[in-house]
Amino acid sequence: MKREQKAQIIEELAGKLRENSVVLVDYQGMDVAQSTELRRRSREAGVDFVVAKNTLTLRAAEEAGLPSLTEFLVGPTALAFSRDPVAAAKLMAEYADEIETFRLKGGLLEGSRVLNEQEVEALSKLPGRDQLIAQVVGGMAAPISGLVSVLNNTIQGLVVALGQIAEQKQAQQA
């Protein structure tokens, strides 16, 4: 590989490392069908699955000013990038459960915190970004809808009471 190509790859990887969370995996022993399936699932989940030389990945991390990933860059290593830290962890952990030779190595959370294998596994069990947003919005909407229900029931009760008073007045006049 020429120097220009290496420099371009390092620059691309550094950009991805700065802008995304990343999960590092050992993909040794995967066949072509398994690799193709993983890439398809990655695209569907919005995860960018990249295989790069360890030396280039190490240089990219240094160029991006990130913590050292040296401990994870031993043997065949692939990187799964995602803006949603949980998405990449969840997908890679699911695949590691399905394929014996595929295993999690570690990760980098939002470009600053190095995660070991157990921490990536724990991250994969959390709800995704969209689910968390939905839970927060639902939590905020619940008290409001409860208030609307109480006010609605109060108004209905008032209308019923006024209707009964009107009937009593009409009965007294008759």
From Swiss-Prot:
Keywords assigned: Ribonucleoprotein, Ribosomal protein, RNA-binding, rRNA-binding
Pfam family, one: Ribosomal_L10
Recorded GO CC terms: ribonucleoprotein complex; ribosome
Keyword RNA-binding set for record: yes
BP-aspect Gene Ontology terms: translation
Oligomer status and interactors: Part of the ribosomal stalk of the 50S ribosomal subunit. The N-terminus interacts with L11 and the large rRNA to form the base of the stalk. The C-terminus forms an elongated spine to which L12 dimers bind in a sequential fashion forming a multimeric L10(L12)X complex.
Domain of life: Bacteria
Gene3D superfamilies associated with the record: 3.30.70.1730, 6.10.250.290
Protein family (similarity comment): Belongs to the universal ribosomal protein uL10 family.
MF (Gene Ontology): large ribosomal subunit rRNA binding
Function: Forms part of the ribosomal stalk, playing a central role in the interaction of the ribosome with GTP-bound translation factors.
Coiled coil: none
Protein name per Swiss-Prot or TrEMBL: Large ribosomal subunit protein uL10
Keyword Ligase tagged: no
Organism in which the protein naturally occurs: Rubrobacter xylanophilus (strain DSM 9941 / JCM 11954 / NBRC 16129 / PRD-1)
